[in-house]
Amino acid sequence: MSVYDKHQALSRLTLGKPTPYHDRYDAALLQPVPRSLNRDPLGIYPDSLPFHGADIWTLYELSWLNNRGVPQVAVGEMHLNAESLNLIESKSFKLYLNSFNQTTFDSWESVRATLANDLAHCAQGDVSVTLFKLSELEGQPLAGFTGECIDDQDIQIDNYNFNADYLATNEQDAPVVEETLVSHLLKSNCLITHQPDWGSVQIHYRGKRINREALLRYIVSFRHHNEFHEQCVERIFNDLMHYYQPEKLSVYARYTRRGGLDINPWRSNTPFNAPNGRLPRQ
């Protein structure tokens, strides 16, 4: 259980509550969650962030009406800067997108600009939005994380409660390496509803070699942990910095789709390119 899952900032959210669906545009449906909820306990403060990054959202269920009443459909891609004061709560995002369904817009650009403006206002940060016609995405192959997968280790695991101290199992004389490690065994739970969130995580670093067994046990220990996607990625980044102090560190997670949305947060203390390629489970 998170130390802040009963915080008053979460009590007003529609998440986990019966909610009517609106099909007329309503920006007020968007609900923010302060990033400080998980950052403050980790000692992460906005004036000295240890990383830069973004939350990359893919919007699969986006539709509106053109001036002649003909429905339009698109796939959207939204990048929310990690320096924003708030993250966007995903159920409210879904309800907000539903409100476009029977709303008339003059152009695709009007839709894009409306999305960008509303999301930036809710998050109190920088947002970019791109809309794709379906024909632009047809035939795109599934992507994969580059790096060495650590999932097939011959170990036994019998504890699935979150424990960052697994990472304390490091070698004092470990050599300095630069490598990319990947796991597809990241599973956490929604902070409010406790529904499972399934993800893959890529960790690129330069520093003392990370103990791969310890890292896998640490990742698996998220299975009973309740936090939003973005918060889990920041926790992983923070814990790796605490135990290993790498010179360079990038953490990128891609989660499976729910409600027509997938969320793919990344955090890094070095220049980092986060390709938005759909993984097999997405």
Curated annotation (Swiss-Prot):
<feature type="active site" description="Proton donor">
    <location>
        <position position="197"/>
    </location>
</feature>
<feature type="binding site">
    <location>
        <begin position="88"/>
        <end position="90"/>
    </location>
    <ligand>
        <name>substrate</name>
    </ligand>
</feature>
<feature type="binding site">
    <location>
        <begin position="229"/>
        <end position="230"/>
    </location>
    <ligand>
        <name>substrate</name>
    </ligand>
</feature>
<keyword id="KW-0671">Queuosine biosynthesis</keyword>
<dbReference type="GO" id="GO:0006400">
    <property type="term" value="P:tRNA modification"/>
</dbReference>
<comment type="similarity">
    <text>Belongs to the GTP cyclohydrolase I family. QueF type 2 subfamily.</text>
</comment>
<dbReference type="GO" id="GO:0005737">
    <property type="term" value="C:cytoplasm"/>
</dbReference>
<dbReference type="InterPro" id="IPR050084">
    <property type="entry name" value="NADPH_dep_7-cyano-7-deazaG_red"/>
</dbReference>
<dbReference type="GO" id="GO:0033739">
    <property type="term" value="F:preQ1 synthase activity"/>
</dbReference>
<comment type="pathway">
    <text>tRNA modification; tRNA-queuosine biosynthesis.</text>
</comment>
<keyword id="KW-0521">NADP</keyword>
<keyword id="KW-0963">Cytoplasm</keyword>
<dbReference type="InterPro" id="IPR029500">
    <property type="entry name" value="QueF"/>
</dbReference>
<dbReference type="Pfam" id="PF14819">
    <property type="entry name" value="QueF_N"/>
</dbReference>
<feature type="active site" description="Thioimide intermediate">
    <location>
        <position position="190"/>
    </location>
</feature>
<comment type="subunit">
    <text>Homodimer.</text>
</comment>
<dbReference type="InterPro" id="IPR029139">
    <property type="entry name" value="QueF_N"/>
</dbReference>
<comment type="function">
    <text>Catalyzes the NADPH-dependent reduction of 7-cyano-7-deazaguanine (preQ0) to 7-aminomethyl-7-deazaguanine (preQ1).</text>
</comment>
<dbReference type="InterPro" id="IPR043133">
    <property type="entry name" value="GTP-CH-I_C/QueF"/>
</dbReference>
<feature type="binding site">
    <location>
        <begin position="258"/>
        <end position="259"/>
    </location>
    <ligand>
        <name>NADPH</name>
    </ligand>
</feature>
<dbReference type="Pfam" id="PF14489">
    <property type="entry name" value="QueF"/>
</dbReference>
<keyword id="KW-0560">Oxidoreductase</keyword>
<protein>
    <recommendedName>
        <fullName>NADPH-dependent 7-cyano-7-deazaguanine reductase</fullName>
        <ecNumber>1.7.1.13</ecNumber>
    </recommendedName>
</protein>
<feature type="binding site">
    <location>
        <begin position="90"/>
        <end position="91"/>
    </location>
    <ligand>
        <name>NADPH</name>
    </ligand>
</feature>
<dbReference type="InterPro" id="IPR016428">
    <property type="entry name" value="QueF_type2"/>
</dbReference>
<dbReference type="GO" id="GO:0008616">
    <property type="term" value="P:queuosine biosynthetic process"/>
</dbReference>
